[in-house]
Every structure is written in structure tokens, then in C-alpha cells.
């Protein structure tokens, strides 16, 4: 997360929350110089010690290690006044998020590594709160549920990612319910967890994850959007979707509804693969070919990230731009082979299937008590009632429209076969 004054000059993120349902504490980020350490306080206000700059990888990498060269950056863009995007990268063995005033080189811990991008919606203040709340809650839940878990296996890991995402959705939804001026707030979430040599992903909305191998960028998430539904139904082409005025309409988000559909997938990684997570402020303007070219020509993820942000801004920068880039290295990974496949691969496990009518097991009754009052400066621009109402109605109409379009399409297919 951007815990300092960012290079683009935008204002520092205001006070945030991190919910620990067992032992709640408040995570407050203050405007500090890049070299300073952010302050964490417990529920009594006591100062907590934080390792802001984890020890980098030793010069000598032990055999079998997986090494990550990672950088993340968020830019406000050319037209927005506020940045509603958020991100986090964290070693789940330690639980501390990494700072990114420089390129980080880290050994992957045995508990995995978290990469996440969130793109808020609902107006400047609401979107900013939703995205920051999402990354804080997901990280906090992974600290609680995963760091001390007795079973370290893919099913348990994916189940933890899913549960953390559900808690984030419930938290944002309940918080908006307690603050009428923020109703309709929501955020996308693209969450990737590296465990061993495999990425496990939880997807909500239309932020994206790409894997770049041998100079080719392949999307390994699937947009939960109107355009994606119409593409799958054969109504429009990918090229038509990219030009559509409705390409930014999403069908799933954290916060607007009490329950959310989470797309769970997985992808094995090889040595020299590059993971790119980004908000649609990047993917909507920069084509996969350009992403692949940038990370291939710029082996340093920091330089690649700067190049991609510059490309998006050169195209007008109409939205916030966030990118997380991780290059995978080390003897713990195999070299790529021709038989390896890259793509949207569903993680299918009976142990993760739960009835859609059953809410996640959460202590939501105590959520309001565990959220610290937010500072007044966070509400410099709150969404107007007209903006919130328009966005809410659009969401309902879009969902209904998708059902109608798909029904008519399949009916037409049946009639043409008679």
C-alpha cells in the first residue's frame, strides 16, 4: 500500500483500518517522509513496533529458493483529483506489507506471498475508502487465518483467500450501511497468492492479472463485466468490447451486495515468468502486447512499471493507474516447457463449494465497533445523492439487461435450429 507521500504528488492516504476480529487494533497511516516508519497502534492507542523495511534477500540464495523481484506503483492519472486504487504486496510468513520506494528482491516464504490490486467506485471518498478497506481487511484476515495455520496446502490456501475476500465484502457492505452517504461504495479485487510454484487467484470485478512468458502476455483472470458476458455469448467481439462505451460496467464488486461471487483460479509459474496485476486504468489503455514488450525489454520491474504508467498517461490517463509487477526467479522454479499452459484455469475443489444462500461465517455484529472513526479530511468530496442513485440503478439495470440479452441470444439459437 502507498504508505508515504507518493511520487506523483497526490495526497497521502488518510487513516485506514485493519480488522482483527479476535484481537482488533487500529492501523493508522500518517504523512511521513519516505524514510520514516509508519505508526501502528493497538486498541488502547499504544504504539506498536513495525518493521517497515524487511530484510532483503541475502546475496547467496539457498538451493530450492524462489526469488521475487517486485515493484508496485499507483498513479492518479491525468484527469482524476483523487486516487481510488489501492494495492498491497506482503510476505505471508511475516505478515508485513512491503514498501515500494525502490525495487524489492525477496525470497518467497513458506507461507506464500500476497499480491493484490483494488479499484474503488462510488465517488472519490467512497471509492478510496472501499479499496483501502479491501486491501487492509484481506491482509489482516490472511494474518489471522493463514500465518499460524496447521495445514499448508493448496485447498487450505485457496479457502483462506476466499474467506478473506468474503470478509472484505461483508465489512465494506456493513460499513456503507452504517454510513448512508457512502452507500453504493464498492471495489474490484484481484488477489494473487503465490504458494510454492503456483499462483492461486481470487477475482472480483475487472482488474486484471497477466502472466508474461517468452514475450507474450496472457490474461489469467476473467473480467466479471458486461462486456465479458456478451463476448462469451457471441454477441460482440473482443475488439468491439474494447471500443464500447459500456466497457467499464462490472457485474461483481466488493461491497454493494451482502454476498459476492468470487472467481477462483490457479496457474503454475516458471523461472523468468512475470506477473502483472493492474487496474483498468492501465489495461483499458495499454494492450497485452505492450505490457509484454515493456516487461520483456525492462528486466527491472520498477522500470517496467514506470514505462507502463507512462504509456497509460500518454493515452490520456483518464483513470487511476495501478500496477504490481513481480518477476519470478530462483532454483525453486523449473524452466518453462512447451507443454506448459497459461490461461484462466478454475480451481475446482468440493471442499470450497458452499451453498450460495448461506452467508460466510463472520462476526459481522461487531464490525461497527471495531472500525475506528474516520477523519473528516477523508470526506473532502463525498458522492452526491444523485451520483449514488444513478450508480445503484445502473447496477440493477445492467444485471437485468445481461439476463435479457443472454435469454434472447439462446432463444434465437434454438429457433434457428428448428
Question: What is each of the regions a protein language model found here?
Answer:
Residues 7, 16-19, 34, 48:
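Leucine-biased recognition of intrinsically disordered, low-complexity hydrophobic segments
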Residues 11-18, 25:
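Intrinsically disordered, low-complexity segments enriched in serine/threonine/proline/glycine
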Amino acid at each position: 500500500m502507498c504508505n508515504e507521500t507518493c511520487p506523483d504528488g497526490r495526497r497521502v492516504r488518510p487513516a485506514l483500518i485493519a480488522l482483527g476480529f479476535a484481537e482488533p487494533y487500529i492501523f493508522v497511516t500518517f504523512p511521513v517522509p519516505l524514510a520514516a516508519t509508519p505508526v501502528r497502534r493497538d486498541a488502547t492507542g499504544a504504539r506498536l513496533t513495525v518493521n517497515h523495511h524487511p530484510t532483503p534477500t541475502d546475496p547467496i540464495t539457498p538451493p530450492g529458493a524462489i526469488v521475487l523481484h517486485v515493484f508496485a506503483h499507483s498513479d492518479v492519472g491525468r484527469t482524476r483529483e483523487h486516487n481510488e486504487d489501492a494495492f498491497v504486496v506482503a510476505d505471508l510468513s511475516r505478515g508485513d506489507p512491503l514498501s515500494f520506494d525502490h525495487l524489492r528482491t525477496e525470497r518467497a516464504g513458506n507461507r506464500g506471498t500476497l499480491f493484490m490490486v483494488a479499484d474503488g467506485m462510488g465517488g472519490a471518498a467512497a471509492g478510496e475508502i472501499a479499496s483501502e478497506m479491501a486491501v487492509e481487511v484481506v491482509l489482516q484476515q490472511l494474518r489471522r487465518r493463514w500465518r499460524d495455520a496447521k495445514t499448508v496446502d493448496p485447498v487450505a490456501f485457496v479457502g483462506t483467500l476466499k474467506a478473506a475476500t468474503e470478509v472484505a465484502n461483508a465489512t465494506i457492505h456493513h460499513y456503507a450501511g452504517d454510513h448512508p452517504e457512502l452507500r453504493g461504495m464498492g471495489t474490484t479485487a484481484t488477489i494473487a497468492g503465490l504458494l510454492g510454484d503456483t499462483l492461486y487467484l481470487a477475482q472480483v470485478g475487472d482488474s486484471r492479472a497477466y502472466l508474461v512468458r517468452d514475450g507474450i502476455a496472457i490474461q489469467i483472470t476473467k473480467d466479471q463485466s458486461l462486456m465479458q458476458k456478451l463476448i462469451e455469448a457471441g454477441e460482440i467481439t473482443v475488439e468491439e468490447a474494447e471500443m464500447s462505451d459500456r466497457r467499464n460496467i462490472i457485474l461483481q464488486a466488493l461491497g454493494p451486495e451482502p454476498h459476492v461471487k468470487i472467481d477462483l483460479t490457479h496457474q503454475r509459474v516458471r523461472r523468468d515468468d512475470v506477473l502483472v496485476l493492474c487496474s483498468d486504468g492501465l489495461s483499458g489503455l495499454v494492450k497485452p502486447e505492450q505490457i509484454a514488450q515493456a516487461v520483456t525489454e525492462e528486466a527491472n520491474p520498477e522500470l517496467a512499471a514506470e514505462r507502463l504508467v507512462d504509456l497509460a498517461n500518454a493515452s490520456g490517463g483518464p483513470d487511476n493507474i495501478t500496477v504490481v509487477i513481480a518477476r519470478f526467479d530462483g532454483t525453486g522454479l523449473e524452466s518453462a516447457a512447451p507443454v506448459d499452459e497459461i490461461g484462466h484455469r478454475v480451481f475446482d475443489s468440493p471442499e470450497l463449494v458452499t451453498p450460495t444462500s448461506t452467508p460466510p461465517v463472520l462476526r459481522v455484529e461487531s464490525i461497527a465497533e471495531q472500525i475506528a472513526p474516520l477523519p473528516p479530511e477523508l470526506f473532502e468530496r463525498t458522492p452526491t445523492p444523485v451520483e449514488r442513485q444513478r450508480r445503484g440503478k445502473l447496477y440493477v439495470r445492467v444485471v437485468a439487461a445481461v439476463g435479457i440479452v443472454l435469454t434472447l441470444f439462446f432463444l434465437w439459437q434454438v429457433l434457428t435450429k428448428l
